[in-house]
Amino acid sequence: VKGVGSHAAYPHEGVDSIVATTAIISSLQQLVSRNIDPQHAVVVSVTHMVAGNTWNVLPDDAIFEGTIRTFDTADRALAKKRFYDVTENVAKAYGVTAEIDWIVGPNVTYNNPELSAFLFEKTSAWHDDVVIPEASNAGEDFATYVEQIPGVFAFIGSNAPGSPGLHFSDMVLKDETIPVAVDYYVNNAFALLEKLRKG
């Protein structure tokens, strides 16, 4: 977000990029609630903002970053369109300009239903704590593979009780899940090979 910097005592001599950026961020929080079907899971999260480097100067520009997560491609397209609309128009209203660098992440990971059912059955035969988790908005590059080749993405459940989840520096992994993960891959690889051999 590009404004015009000024001394903090004379904000009228500049165009405040911080005020404009916070207005954009605030407006983006309504993107889901007023544009997307409430039955659909869509998340808009602004996770990082940087502006200025001292206490008495209003900076020329500000940067913010975040992510939009959807399960539906139409929702993804609409969220992107509305993101551009909101960002550019709020910027214009505040007298600043906005430059958007949109990075396309992986699509949603869809497990192959037939393989999922097969692996659930096989894994349940040797492990008594197998569950089908709720859909997750977490992004995963594995989605690119299962778009081309039928596959299954599984969570092993390695996070210790009470420990923070993914991407937290103090996440604690349970060592006892390592053999469970090995068993999952080895047992199911043999089960799938046997299934393929039998046709």
Please provide the spans of the model-predicted regions.
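Predominant activation on well-ordered alpha-helical scaffold segments within soluble catalytic domains
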Residues: 18-29, 84, 116, 120, ...
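Mature, folded catalytic cores of secreted/periplasmic enzymes
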Residues: 31, 39, 43, 55, ...
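Midchain, well-structured core segments that form catalytic/ion-binding scaffolds
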Residues: 1-111, 136-137
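Glycine-rich loops and low-complexity Gly/Arg-rich segments
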Residues: 23-26, 70-73, 89-94, 123-127, ...
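Active-site-adjacent substrate-binding region
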Residues: 26-33, 101, 105-157
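Short, charged N-terminal helix-start/capping segments
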Residues: 1-8, 116, 121-123, 189
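Alpha-helix N-cap and loop-to-helix initiation/capping positions
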Residues: 16, 111-114, 173-176
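Zn-dependent metallopeptidase/amidohydrolase metal-coordination segment
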Residues: 128-195
